[in-house]
A protein has these predicted regions:
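Helix-breaking motifs and short loop linkers at transmembrane-helix boundaries and internal kinks
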Residues: 58, 90, 111-117, 145, ...
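C-terminal transmembrane helical hairpin of 12-TM major facilitator-type secondary transporters
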Residues: 294-339
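Cytoplasmic helix-loop-helix junction between adjacent transmembrane helices
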Residues: 121-159
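Helix-loop-helix hairpin linking two adjacent transmembrane segments in secondary transporters
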Residues: 154-203
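A late C-terminal transmembrane helix in Major Facilitator Superfamily
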Residues: 346-383
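Conserved MFS/SLC helix-loop-helix module at the cytosolic interface between two early adjacent transmembrane helices
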Residues: 77-113
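Extracytoplasmic gate region of multi-pass secondary transporters
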Residues: 46-47, 229-282, 340
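Intracellular juxtamembrane helix-capping segments at the cytosolic ends
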Residues: 131-144, 333-347
Length: 413
């Protein structure tokens, strides 16, 4: 088949060094990192405040689980479209538009009048989040070249920090103001302010880095179909990990507050510890490369064990802090990066982009359905039994599927 080979770009880092000081570059990374941090804060604050939101809107537990994660539908759709949009409008406009978009819909969330309008507003935040994420990583990859791994690792650290601060600060704002709406006003306004600051300070040489390619060469490359058994097994397994994650993130704070009697602040703090664990992603990626693909099995067993303990009536606050942290380390700090690596190594190098899109679609598409189904099962079976199906069980099914994976045909590069 005829494909476009990877394009050769100018040495970006060397050119940038002559026009921007190291201090300025660090400042740009910090600014983008902070904008990415607000992305995570917006995601995580909603489930942390779900008990109060449900009370105000009269939502059932399944409806609450749905609106907590409905944004993932648009993350999948617009993440796929972000490449075309960046080509059409430029990274800078997509980056700023995404940041303003999800911040605006975060700001508008308290103006919802019922379940439908609330779900629509939360879904629309996913549009902005997807565009911002795509643009940030495109800018980082092009600007830093061979050092893109460290730069992207820094972004993941900011995301983990946001996943911690979102629920921790959000629940405290509710406690201080006696209103769950305060967090959405503060986070929304802050996000728009960061967008304005980014528009003023981020130079075109940063967002446009590497966009003057040499002439691409069309070369005949004989490749197999992307749909191999290994890709199917790893992508479905990654999707099952997504079911576990979105079930946990949508209703964990509701469980600790409603069933264990944690205060809203303590429930938010327990959920926020996931973010601290997620900040270990740069270590998890390195460790996964050292241990190899089969390290997935150990991590899946750890995830299943921690998931079981989280929802089985252990009322010690410090224990939930530890368990939620471990969930974050295992899920986002290790399994997310390991599965993305395994999926990419399941196909020809020219098909990596398509394989990654398939994997991310599997991971994110379960979001709204996982939260809703978990809530329905809780109403029918109770928290302990429902969590076996939705949080602890999926990683064990993934163990079975990955045992069928043919590692002898997986690429080692």
């Amino acid at each position: 088949m005829v494909t476009d080979q990877a394009v050769t770009y100018r040495p970006i880092v060397e050119e940038a060094a002559s026009s921007s000081s190291t201090r300025r570059t660090i400042g740009l990374v910090l600014l983008l990192g902070i904008s990415y941090m607000f992305n995570a804060m917006d995601r995580q604050v909603f489930p942390a405040l779900l008990a109060s939101i449900r009370a105000d809107y009269g939502l059932t537990l399944p409806q609450g689980g749905f609106v907590s994660t409905v944004f993932t539908i648009n993350v999948v759709i617009f993440a796929a479209l972000s490449g075309w949009l960046m080509t059409r409008f430029g990274r800078r406009h997509v980056l700023l538009g995404g940041l303003v978009g999800y911040s605006l819909f975060t700001l508008l969330t308290p103006f919802a009048t019922g379940f439908v309008s609330l779900a629509i507003l939360r879904a629309l935040t996913g549009v902005g989040e997807a565009l911002q994420i795509g643009a940030i990583f495109a800018c980082m990859g092009a600007y830093f070249g061979a050092r893109r791994g460290a730069a992207m690792g820094a972004m993941q650290t900011f995301f983990g920090l946001g996943a911690f601060l979102g629920p921790v600060l959000g629940t405290r704002l509710e406690s201080w103001t006696n209103s769950w709406s305060a967090s959405f006003y503060v986070y929304g306004i802050a996000g728009i302010a960061v967008a304005v600051l980014a528009a003023v300070t981020i130079p075109l040489e940063f967002t446009n880095a590497g966009q003057s390619p040499s002439v691409a060469q069309n070369v005949d490359v004989q490749t197999k179909s992307i749909w191999t058994r290994n890709l199917a097994l790893s992508a479905i397994s990654f999707g099952l990990v997504g079911v576990s994650f979105f079930s946990y993130s949508s209703l964990y704070a509701s469980y600790t507050h409603g069933m264990l009697g944690f205060s809203v602040v303590d429930a938010g703090s327990a959920l926020g510890m996931y973010g601290i664990g997620a900040m270990c992603g740069f270590v998890g990626g390195w460790l996964g490369d050292k241990l190899g693909n089969k390290s997935i099995f150990g991590a899946l067993f750890v995830l299943a064990t921690v998931s079981y303990l989280l929802f089985h009536d252990m009322a010690l606050f410090w224990l939930h802090l530890l368990l939620s942290f471990t969930f974050g380390v295992t899920m986002s700090g290790f399994l997310f990066t390991r599965f993305m690596s395994v999926v990419q190594r399941s196909v020809h190098p020219s098909q990596i982009g398509h394989a990654g899109a398939v994997a991310l679609a599997g991971f994110y598409l379960s979001g709204p359905f996982a939260g809703y189904l978990f809530g329905k099962l809780v109403e029918t079976l109770g928290w302990s039994s429902a969590s076996l199906f939705m949080v602890a069980g999926p990683p064990l099914v993934a163990v079975v599927l990955m045992s069928l994976y043919d590692y002898s045909t997986s690429r080692n590069d």
